[in-house]
Each structure stands twice: as structure tokens, then as C-alpha cells.
């Protein structure tokens, strides 16, 4: 088993290939469009909850080796931007920033309000980040992966920068991922 699979991102097969690679094991996936001179700024996108904690821990261990700083971002929906939700999200992000500091990664929290995909892409542009980190969606009850949703949309729009997809044990321990063709495919790129 591997912790991380790194591969060249391929726009023509982007989301479909990423799903196939994630189906092949319990690893995380780093999609890289081209050689990167350095990764100094990382945007870690999380939702409050246990899978988000896993995203922070894995990414923190990786990012400390890069010597990069991080921004920990959560996006609240417009109709969910209530004081209680904002306070809960703020506490979650503050705990994540403390965790990253313990790992030697300087970090800052950020909360945006709006459509998740649009707000993440806007933050990527404004912050000029070198790496985007997204949590792999939890497997749906029918066993299918959900990269065709928000994560898939972001993968399609962020093709110019590396994207790390972090898998939580909460998604790994559920039903296996099935591809868009309805079966588990084991791509040759992963099986050696």
C-alpha cells in the first residue's frame, strides 16, 4: 500500500482518471500539471468534522517538508452563514491552525460565504496559491465516488496548479468506489 500517488494531471481524462486511481487503494492523490519550481503557499479546503481533521493532519505532514505556509479555508453556504455556524467553523479552523503549527507549518484561517466551487476558485486566484488541497468526498451509499460533484468541478477548473486529494479513513472504510461505468477499474498506472 502507498500513502500518496503522484501523477501528471491529464485534462482529457481528468476526473474519470482521478476516480479510477482513488478506487485502486486507500492512498491520497496528488495531480500535478507540470513540474513545479516550489510550493510556497498551500490552500487547504476543509469542512468542519472528522474528515476535515484528517485532511489537515496528512497535509500538514506533507507541507512541512515543502517549507510552505498554509491557509485553512472553509466555505459556508449563503443560507448557512449564521453566527452559530460561523463560530463553530471558526473554532474548527483555529484548531486546525494550531495543529499545523505543531507540525511546523505556519497557517492562517479563512472563512468565505457562497457557492463552494466559486469561493475556492476565487481564493486560489486572490491568494496565488501553489497547491490546492481538497478532501475526497465520502463514498455515497451506492458505493460510487462523488468526484463528479464539487471536487470534480474544481479539478476541471484548477488544471493549471497541483491538486492534492486527501482521503479520510471515513471514506476508505465505507463501500468501495465504483467508477462512472458501474465497476471498479484498476488502472495500470497504479498497479505495478
Task: Place the predicted regions along the sequence by residue.
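Structural motif
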Residues: 8, 110-111
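Residue-level preference for nonpolar/small residues embedded in alpha-helices
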Residues: 13-14, 55, 92, 116, ...
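Generic hydrophobic alpha-helical segments
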Residues: 59, 119-120
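Charged docking surfaces used in two-component/phosphorelay signaling
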Residues: 112-119
